Every structure is written in C-alpha cells, then in structure tokens.
C-alpha cells in the first residue's frame, strides 16, 4: 500500500475530495456551536431552573449536564449537533489510524491503534451521555460520562506521547505547532478536571455559595480544551485533502 500522501487515484472513481481543514472545522463547529448555544440560552431563558442546586445556594452558572440535557430547546440542539458530528469524528479517527500506521515506528504501532480505539470509544460515550441524560437515565449517563472521561484523558496523553517520542521522521513545523497545542490543552484539561472534582465534592459537603459556579466553570474548560485538542488535527494534516474512492476507501493525499 502506498503512503497516503503518494496515492494516485482515477478521478472517475473518486466519490469526494475536500481539504482536511474543512472536515476538521465542521467536526469542531457542530459541538462547539451547540455547547455555546445551550449555555447562553440557559442563562438567558432558563437561569433559575438551570442554576438551581440541591441545597439552594447562590449559583450563577448551569452545569454542563443542566445546560445541555435538562431543558428544551437546548436538549434537542445538543443532540442534533452530536448526532451530526459523530460521523465526522469517526472519519477523523479512521484517518488517524492510517496516519499512525505510516508515521509511528513499528514497535509502537499497537499503541497507535489503541489510541484510535480509545478515540472511537470516547466519541461513542459522548453520544450515549448526550442521548441518555442525567435527568432521563442517571446510571446510563453516569457510566457513559466515566467512560468518556477515562478514554478522553488516556487518548490525549497517548496521542501527545506518540507524536513526541514514537515517530519515524522528524516533525514538520506545523506538526510541532500541533504537538505544543496538544501538550498545553492536555495539561489545562487535567488541571480543570481536578479542580471541577474538588469543587463538586466541596459543594456537596459544605453547600457554600458560589462553589457550584466554579464547578460549572471548570467543567466548561474541560469541554472546551477537549474540543481544542481534537482540533489539533487541523495542523497534523495541514495542506492535505480527504479523498474517498472505490479502491482505497477514505484516506489523505496531497493531490
């Protein structure tokens, strides 16, 4: 099999061709736009209900679960965004699988396959926790959330380490830029997740005014840094096209 960037294809057999940048932006814009819509709508039109806490202390921000899963039209908008973006995310995971097979040393290739598997499980867990909300099915939502977080953190760490330590060739400038973003976004994500966990435990233990607001804020940072991390694919596949043809299926090419 030829490397993805050298494959030649017959135009008659090509189903579609598009710049990878468009695919990356589409995969990000749907959940990002849905997330901001849900938070802003909740603050403007469902502030009292979405910021209510079990001990009725002062709170100024809805949690992610409250913003995206408890009220309409937020619930429908978020589900639609996740449903539409899932095929794009799975396509990107497939492209990364090809990328790791060609750019990662043979001795580390299984780790690349594992990273792609974790990415797919993360995507499916996000789908599940979005369609089975905490209000509708708490146990399913909780389990999907645990799987999502575990796979997300493991995937981000493995993706960073594979690109830093396991490559066969030297990083290009745009790949170095992607690697720096991966490192920084992963570190901020882990820190925000730890602080969100601390605020959640403290809120449940003490019911102090404003603590749940910080919990929600750190939740937002976790969500946004996760999206940002996946957006680094924009630089990983800089100036490449996504092609799907009858012979090779889905792959990347410079042509």
UniProtKB/Swiss-Prot annotation:
It holds the Pfam family Frag1. GO terms for cellular component: endoplasmic reticulum membrane; Golgi membrane. The chain crosses the membrane at residues 25-45, 80-100, 111-131, 143-163, 185-205, 209-229. GO terms for biological process: GPI anchor biosynthetic process. It is a multi-pass membrane protein. InterPro entries: Frag1/DRAM/Sfk1, PGAP2. It is found in: Golgi apparatus membrane; Endoplasmic reticulum membrane. Its main location: Golgi. Involved in the lipid remodeling steps of GPI-anchor maturation. Required for stable expression of GPI-anchored proteins at the cell surface. This is Post-GPI attachment to proteins factor 2.
């Amino acid at each position: 099999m030829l490397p993805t960037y050298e494959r030649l294809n017959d135009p008659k057999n090509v189903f579609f061709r598009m710049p990878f940048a468009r695919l990356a932006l589409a995969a990000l814009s749907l959940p990002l736009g849905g997330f901001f819509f849900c938070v802003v709508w909740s603050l403007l039109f469902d502030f009292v209900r979405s910021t209510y806490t079990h001990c009725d202390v002062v709170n100024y921000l809805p949690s992610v679960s409250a913003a995206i899963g408890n009220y309409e039209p937020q619930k429908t908008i978020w589900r639609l965004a996740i449903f539409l973006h899932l095929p794009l995310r799975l396509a990107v995971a497939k492209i990364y699988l090809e990328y790791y097979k060609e750019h990662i040393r043979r001795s580390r290739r299984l780790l690349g396959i594992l990273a792609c598997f974790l990415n797919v499980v993360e995507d499916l867990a996000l789908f599940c926790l979005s369609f089975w909300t905490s209000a509708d099915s708490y146990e399913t939502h909780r389990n999907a959330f645990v799987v999502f977080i575990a796979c997300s953190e493991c995937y981000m760490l493995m993706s960073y380490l594979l690109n830093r330590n396991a490559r066969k060739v030297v990083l290009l400038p745009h790949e170095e830029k992607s690697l720096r973003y991966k490192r920084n976004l992963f570190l901020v994500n882990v820190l925000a997740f730890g602080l969100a966990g601390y605020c959640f435990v403290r809120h449940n233990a003490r019911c102090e005014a404003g603590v749940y607001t910080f919990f929600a804020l750190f939740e937002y940072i976790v969500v946004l840094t996760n999206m940002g991390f996946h957006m680094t694919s924009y630089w990983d596949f800089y100036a490449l096209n996504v092609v799907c043809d009858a012979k090779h299926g889905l792959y990347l090419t410079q042509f």
